[in-house]
Amino acid sequence: VNLAAALARTGMGVMVVDIDPQGNASTALNIPHTGDVASVYDVLLGEMEIQDVVQDAPDVDGLQVVPATIDLAGAEIELVSLVAREQRLSRALEAYTAWREEDGQERLDYVFIDCPPSLGLLTVNAFVAAEEVLIPIQAEYYALEGLSQLLKNVQMIQKHLNPRLQVSTILLTMFDARTNLAVQVAEEVRTHFPEQLLNTAIPRNVRISEAPSY
């Protein structure tokens, strides 16, 4: 969300696609996403096009949002029986790009897809549609296990569905340099992913946790 807003404020055309049933990205960008709002759920099921559901972020010029709703919680079950279930989002984005061109609108510079913290069909749809994966990882031991599983899934997607997909960026979050564990996690990630790990880390800070409530 912060990356998307920052890029939009430089004058770039940016869109955030929220496919997390919790809808935190939609909330953070002040986008309505109650159950009666047209959303990415309708797009994935083929009932609407992206241009029918996309909204302008009220607080950031040049930033568009395809919101999530709680309906996404059951979307994975509904998607199982659909044709090309792993490619629903990819095809919708391609159609939206073509529509923008026909409508005389400029091509978007960036599309961010906010995924749920799981590796189901929603996340697979994101991987098939994307070119790059940005992984935020908490500086905690169990996060390393999650990273390992995520990378296996990325490799599977590369092999079978999207060969252009690559892990381009890993960002350490909730990093506390005063703890040995955080330092060890950072060193472990840096050893295995020296090119992908950013030098910048987001520190553990209670004010960051409190910020969404304001």
Describe each model-derived feature in a short phrase.
Residues 1-214:
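P-loop NTP-binding core
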